[in-house]
Amino acid sequence: MSSYVANSFYKQSPNIPAYNMQTCGNYGSASEVQASRYCYGGLDLSITFPPPAPSNSLHGVDMAANPRAHPDRPACSAAAAPGHAPGRDEAAPLNPGMYSQKAARPALEERAKSSGEIKEEQAQTGQPAGLSQPPAPPQIYPWMTKLHMSHETDGKRSRTSYTRYQTLELEKEFHFNRYLTRRRRIEIANNLCLNERQIKIWFQNRRMKWKKDSKMKSKEAL
């Protein structure tokens, strides 16, 4: 049924010569174009072109020399009524769509990144060469720390406080050997997390105490 209606909707009359651009005169006058005949359901739907009106334009536009020849034609100012639709030049600006907004976001992000990089470069160049950032403190491992705390204030060296374990090991070593060689002194310092000077001073003080005690005992014996 649909194919029958589609085939019978428009039926063109027998072959009509094609539209010839060379026989149209000045830009294709309507009078020189052959009329087409169409029929549908027994009705004649032929198209006829009215004869052209005399004109003084080269392009076939009807423009009378006297503007009073068409009194019914409204003026241009009257045509532009308050409720008229805007023309092509007066068309409202188009609202940017979703895709244009998405395309504008990367551009804004790139501008923000570039401005941030410029600010960082200015901040780096603004610092003088002498005022550089302080170096990070060196990492201290447990084996590098010492058990004693020695603080130097007012140019005077404070007394070294030995731990109980250090004192016990030094007393054992003094009991077997009251005078240490440099090699043995370095070995004990490494084992007790002390330096060679501290070991040397401790043995000096311990020998003085030992001599003092021995003198006291000799006097009491007399």
UniProtKB/Swiss-Prot annotation:
* InterPro entries registered for this protein in UniProt: Antp_homeobox_Deformed_sf, HD, HD_metazoa, Homeobox_antennapedia, Homeobox_Antennapedia_CS, Homeobox_CS, Homeodomain-like_sf
Motif Antp-type hexapeptide, residue numbers: 140-145
Q: What keyword terms does UniProt attach to this protein?
A: Developmental protein, DNA-binding, Homeobox, Nucleus, Transcription, Transcription regulation
Q: What subcellular compartments does it reside in?
A: Nucleus
Q: Where is the composition biased (Basic and acidic residues)?
A: 107-122
* GO terms for biological process, alphabetical: anterior/posterior pattern specification; embryonic skeletal system development; regulation of transcription by RNA polymerase II
Q: What cellular-component terms does GO give this entry? A: cell junction; chromatin; nucleoplasm; nucleus
**Matches recorded under CDD domains:** homeodomain (cd00086)
Q: Which Pfam families match?
A: Homeodomain
Question: Family assignment?
Answer: Belongs to the Antp homeobox family.
PANTHER family listed in its UniProt record: HOMEOBOX C5, HOMEOTIC PROTEIN DEFORMED
Protein name as it appears in the record: Homeobox protein Hox-C5
Organism for this UniProt entry:
Homo sapiens (Human)
The organism's taxonomic lineage, starting at the top: Eukaryota, Metazoa, Chordata, Craniata, Vertebrata
This chain is encoded by the gene named: HOXC5
